[in-house]
Amino acid sequence: MDEGQALHSYFKYFGLTETVKWKKMDAEFDQISFDDGSVFHHASSWSEFEKTLIADFPEEADAIRSYSAAIQKAVKTFPLDELKFSELDHTDSELLDLSAKAFIDGLTQNEKLRAVLAGSNLLYAGSAEKCPFYVHALVSNGYVLSAYKCLDGGSQIAKELA
């Protein structure tokens, strides 16, 4: 929701940046928790996301940085995510064909880190085997960069658009 981010552009286009009350979430706005009591946080910028996860998985620093860089690269491949109207670059077909699971599994053998990186799949009901990496990238990027909530509830968006 910060200026220059995809959601800000969309909400501004629909006139929602002035009429809906927004609140930025805390820096570590979400957490992935496991039955064993371990908790891992998602932070609200890619640099903080990396820093937070590297603190939890120091031996996986390269994998975490690679994940972050790949997400950001994938998002730039899809110009509509930033309301830039240009041709989609189909030359990087690997991006279109690769599943999110295959991408994440290729980064690390650490099962817990794999689960943490895939944790946002619930946001879009992503099926591990079927969800394309680019869908995971677009959702994860929006989630990490636009950690805001509607102060008076999400229904105000529907009311404003009606």
Language-model features: locations:
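Helical element adjacent to the flavin cofactor pocket in flavoenzyme catalytic cores
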Residues: 136-162
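Generic, ordered loop/turn and secondary-structure boundary motif
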Residues: 2, 23-26, 41-43, 124, ...
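Short acidic-hydrophobic surface loop/beta-edge motif
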Residues: 30-34
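A short mid-domain helix/strand-loop element embedded in enzyme catalytic domains
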Residues: 11, 131-135
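N-terminal FAD cofactor-binding segment of flavoenzymes
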Residues: 1-29, 108-111
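Rossmann-like flavin
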Residues: 35-131
